[in-house]
Regions:
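N-terminal glycine-rich phosphate-binding loop and ensuing alpha1 helix
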Residues: 1-62
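Conserved beta-loop-beta/alpha segment of the NTase-like Rossmann-fold superfamily
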Residues: 62-154
Length: 154
């Protein structure tokens, strides 16, 4: 199962932070909100993520492009221009980053990532700026038992 995370809004209510970076990249305990959301889903066995990027999406792309390096112990040999990775602390995640536009609304963002979702497969869909204490397994079970098109938690 995949988790689609909306990470493209402007974050106007906390503009003192979001003029530099998108709201999902605001840090809590030294890690972006987005990372915390992904850790929660990962704890429930969901490790395949589609991130709907928009406003300053390049910052999210740069974060994941450099994630492995930042989470590992490395030695840089400046004389030989070599890098040696000693310890890898990366997550067991697959992250697809899609530019869904700066002004695209929620439905439009979901439509733009549809090609990255498997036909007929259930997926989780969440905002990238809020962390909650929801049992994802029970939520998915509830959804599957009731056979509806969508299940909303709030």
């Amino acid at each position: 199962m995949k988790a689609v995370i909306l990470a493209g809004g402007l974050g106007t209510r906390i503009s003192e932070e979001t003029h530099l970076k998108p709201k999902p990249m605001i840090e809590i305990g030294g890690k972006p909100i987005l990372w915390h959301i992904m850790k929660i889903y990962s704890a429930y066995g969901i490790n395949d993520f589609i991130i709907c990027c928009g406003y300053k999406g390049y910052i999210i792309k740069e974060y994941f492009a450099n994630y492995f390096l930042h989470m590992s112990d490395v030695t840089f040999d400046m004389t030989s221009n070599q890098m040696e990775v000693h310890q890898r602390n990366a997550e067991n995640w697959r992250v697809t980053l899609i530019d869904t536009g700066d002004d695209t609304l929620t439905g439009g963002r979901l439509k733009r990532v549809a090609t990255y979702l498997d036909d007929g497969e259930d997926f989780c869909f969440t905002y990238g700026d809020g962390v909650s204490d929801i049992n994802i397994t029970k939520l998915i079970e509830f959804h599957q038992q009731h056979g509806h098109l969508a299940t909303l938690s709030a």
